[in-house]
């Protein structure tokens, strides 16, 4: 898991899953940020950040997909397409 994005199509809340590079070698952890893109193009509204073990993050990802969340390209940050 390098980085991935999931969005709830009904309300546009989005999860960003990305590695914690500082812990990746010894104890693989993932940051999971929840936010929503702003319609006027201003910075995203970030609500929460979780710090999960890689296995837990993968389970969470699969669970969200089973509830209808969809993979999307980057929604905010340097990789986002505007």
Tell what function each PLM region has.
Residues 1-82:
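Terminus-proximal functional modules
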């Amino acid at each position: 898991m390098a980085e991935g994005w999931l969005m709830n199509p009904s309300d546009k809340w989005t999860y960003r899953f990305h590695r914690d590079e500082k812990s990746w070698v010894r104890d693989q952890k993932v940051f999971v940020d929840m936010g929503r893109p702003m319609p006027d193009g201003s910075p995203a509204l970030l609500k929460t950040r979780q710090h999960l073990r890689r296995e837990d993050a993968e389970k969470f990802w699969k669970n969200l997909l089973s509830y209808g969340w969809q993979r999307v390209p980057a929604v905010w940050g340097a990789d986002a397409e505007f």
